[in-house]
Amino acid sequence: MLKSAKGTWITDWNPEDPKRWDPALAWRTLWITTFNLTLSFITWYVVSALVVRLPKVGFELSTTQLFWLTAMPGLAGGTLRIIWTFLPPILGTRHLVTFSTLLLLIPLLGWGFAVQNTGTPYWVLLLLAFLAGIGGGHFSGYMPSTSYFFPKRLQGTALGLQAGIGNFGVSIVQFVTPWIIGFALFGSLLGGPQTFTPKPGVSQPIWLQNATFAWVPFVLLGALLAWVYLRSVPIRANFREQFDIFRDKHTWIMTSLYIMTFGSFSGFSAIFPLLIREVYGKFEGAPDPLRYAFLGPLVGSLARVIAGPISDRLGGAIVTQVSAIGIFLSALLVTLYTRPTSLDQFPMFVVAMLLIFFFSGVGNASTFKQMPMIFPPRQAGGVIGWTAAVAAYGPFLFSTLAAYTQQATGGFTAFFYGLMVFYAFNFFLNWYYYARKGAEKPC
């Protein structure tokens, strides 16, 4: 067994050779990187937890402006994933994870101060929302970086754990936020409370800055752990070879399928709180969006973990077929409750939305199983990085389309009908190329 180097770069590393592999270092790398990836997802989605409170503390923002705030982290996340895909061989794991984690301090501190002043210009809020997308970019750097440390027989397990646990960051931030903003976590050290007015004549103090300041100590801890305990594997980077994936039609087919699955997960995670607010907020005794919003990403993340082994046994294509059918029917069910006449319809609206999250989580796992089966090893990593980057635009696409639909039609039913067309198209693509008998690339 290889003894880990004390400096940054490891020499003579080969996970396929037990004498040149250090499993303790590999698993340590996985857990530290996963901890930091979870913080990245928390930062990426903290805006979705904040926006539903902003109008009630004095920010004068329209529905369209609120949706654009949830859109910007997705715009940044997708773009930055393309950049982060190329960083692991350049920076190495130690520097990549350490410095990427420290970058999270910019949006966390920025939002912590911005929410305390209702006069903060809208363009500043948009910029801070965009910067929160830094957390979304990390995924495409951390995943390949971690893969360098494991033999192929363990890469599926290791990366499945990292992706699955990292996704829980979305539900963590949406679950913790309504609790943590309810008391003076830092006393008066980092600012006083805001006046929250859930309905006319009723007000209470809240500390919105806690939603971001609370994660700063964890970010500093994550960066310290990465710098002290992580090492880097020298990897030859040949970027020109990777570009041939764009000449393969299956790259584009899998991109579409992953937009259906992870794009739906990430997109609905961003807008679920606002959907609850806009669709059911008009009723007396309207539900608090943040009491329910975290359930969606929680269900989706659990489904991804569960569906991984099932995809290994049954094959990714057949599980993706089930995912596509499930998302389509769930979206159809949602449309029955997007123009409610009473709060009695709210429970079924939540159930239908959770079904979308469940089946999108299933598809997240199965599509990751398909790609290594469709592409040779040299291309598979690039395809996974590319599809993950494009699907990370989910929050941007879903937020802007939902805002446009609401503005044009006064509701969200047409938004879900449009998604159903896209889901049906992807059902056909997956069936024709991968799932049917005699398919071009059975997987």
From Swiss-Prot:
What sections of the protein cross the membrane?
32-52, 66-86, 95-115, 123-143, 172-192, 210-230, 256-276, 292-312, 314-334, 346-366, 383-403, 409-429
An example GO BP is:
nitrate assimilation
Family per similarity comment? Belongs to the major facilitator superfamily. Nitrate/nitrite porter (TC 2.A.1.8) family.
**PANTHER family in the record, alphabetically?**
HIGH-AFFINITY NITRATE TRANSPORTER 2.3
User: What is this protein's name?
Assistant: Probable nitrate/nitrite antiporter NarK2
Query: What is the species listed in this Swiss-Prot or TrEMBL entry?
Result: Thermus thermophilus
Q: Does the keyword Protease apply?
A: no
Q: Which Gene3D superfamilies is this protein grouped with? A: MFS general substrate transporter like domains
